[in-house]
């Protein structure tokens, strides 16, 4: 009886452990590098459509369910909101640290395999006459062959990410930092 109890406890504790982080494979790293480059260019050039296109479809579905909007209408609204924000904010010196990215591998309840990485980003923003240096973690997720990106720089954003990707619930992520500049 003790053996069965111990085996059950061991199995439960192993299931509770997060998947081991691993370095990205060469092909994965190249694909992620291209996707990050396209995403950063979209931000730098004020391409709201490109920014929204990079959002994970599962997150868009959650927003759609919460708002009652169909995906096309929701994406149109998100592009308009992002465009309005980008028109009042200048972003420069945008960079992502790709030097030491460790990936996690997870399988969702529907059988979808997801590779995820936290990408440190830094940029300078100017809005309303104020300039700030921003350091933000960016969640990169690969489902199938496509990489998608989601900011996770606050509790609400992390909660939305965990709704779409339950394996993220309870994970600790680097905090965003904003430093005013003169």
Task: Name each model feature, range by range.
Residues 60-71:
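A short gly/proline-enriched turn/hairpin at secondary-structure junctions
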Residues 127-137, 141-182:
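Low-complexity, intrinsically disordered terminal/linker segments enriched in charged
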Residues 47-62:
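Short, well-ordered alpha-helical segments enriched in acidic and aromatic residues
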Residues 21-26, 76-80, 174-182:
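Compositionally biased, proline/threonine/alanine/serine-rich low-complexity intrinsically disordered stretches
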Residues 1-4:
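Positively charged n-region of N-terminal signal peptides that target proteins for export
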Residues 7-16:
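Bacterial N-terminal signal peptides
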Residues 22, 73-133:
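Surface-exposed, charged secondary-structure patches
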Residues 19-45:
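Short, low-complexity N-terminal intrinsically disordered segments enriched in polar/charged residues
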């Amino acid at each position: 009886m003790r053996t069965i109890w111990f085996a059950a406890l061991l199995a439960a504790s192993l299931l509770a452990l997060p998947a081991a982080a691993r370095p990205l494979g060469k092909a994965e790293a190249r694909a992620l590098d291209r996707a990050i480059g396209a995403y950063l260019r979209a931000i730098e050039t004020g391409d709201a459509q490109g920014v929204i296109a990079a959002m994970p479809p599962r997150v868009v579905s959650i927003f759609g369910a919460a708002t009652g909007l169909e995906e096309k209408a929701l994406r149109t609204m998100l592009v308009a909101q992002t465009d309005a924000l980008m028109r009042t904010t200048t972003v420069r010196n945008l960079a992502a640290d790709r030097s030491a990215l460790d990936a996690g591998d997870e399988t969702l309840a529907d059988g979808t395999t997801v590779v995820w990485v936290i990408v440190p980003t830094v940029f300078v923003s100017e809005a309303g006459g104020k300039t700030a240096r921003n350091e933000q973690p960016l969640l990169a997720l690969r489902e199938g062959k496509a990489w998608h990106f989601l900011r996770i720089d606050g509790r609400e954003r992390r909660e939305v990410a965990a709704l779409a990707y339950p394996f993220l619930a309870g994970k600790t992520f680097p905090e965003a930092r904003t430093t005013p500049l003169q």
